[in-house]
């Protein structure tokens, strides 16, 4: 899936992840950002990172909010647990300090709750359609890449409720054997 909980069972199943990108009619990201439920956790709408801009590209930024949807972690449903502003969908994007600004790297290194998985391009066997496009998860190169124009977010904000995690008290012998 697009996101995977670090904790199995009810804790992982309590999580929701919401992304706000730059896709809206004026290309600034402000229309979707202003309507986004988690706007208050971020300073401004996503746009273009300085790294991608320096290569002539645009619209690579997203905001990611990790939410305690059911209140299992914080005690209050709907609490924003983590906010990741101005991440890039370009796989080689760098922050101003030289570290990776690629959303999968940042989430893997910093999140206490989730990993970023694979998005469903076009539609999967269940008919899921997270987005369609070719530029996400590719390297930014010199030229006029427009990461936003290749992404169809619908409203520009996608939200995933994590489900399917199972709690287990202990592993049996066959569980260990299947693991090797």
Regions found by a protein language model. Give the residues of each.
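Surface-exposed assembly/interface segments
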Residues: 1-180
């Amino acid at each position: 899936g697009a996101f995977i909980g670090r904790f199995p069972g009810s804790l992982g199943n309590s999580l929701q992840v919401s992304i706000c990108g730059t896709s809206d009619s004026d290309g600034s990201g402000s229309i979707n950002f202003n309507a986004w439920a988690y706007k208050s956790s971020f300073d401004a709408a996503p746009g273009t990172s300085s790294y991608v801009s320096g290569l002539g590209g645009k619209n690579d930024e997203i905001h990611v909010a990790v939410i305690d949807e059911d209140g299992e972690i914080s005690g209050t449903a709907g609490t924003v647990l983590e906010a990741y502003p101005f991440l890039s969908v370009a796989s080689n994007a760098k922050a101003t300090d030289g570290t990776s600004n690629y959303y999968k790297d940042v989430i893997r290194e910093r999140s206490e709750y989730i990993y970023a998985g694979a998005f469903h391009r076009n539609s999967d066997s269940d008919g899921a359609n997270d987005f369609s496009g070719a530029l996400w998860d590719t390297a930014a190169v010199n030229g006029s890449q427009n990461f936003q124009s290749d992404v169809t977010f619908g409203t520009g904000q996608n939200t995933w409720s994590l489900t399917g995690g199972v709690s287990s008290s202990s592993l049996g012998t066959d569980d260990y054997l299947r693991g090797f």
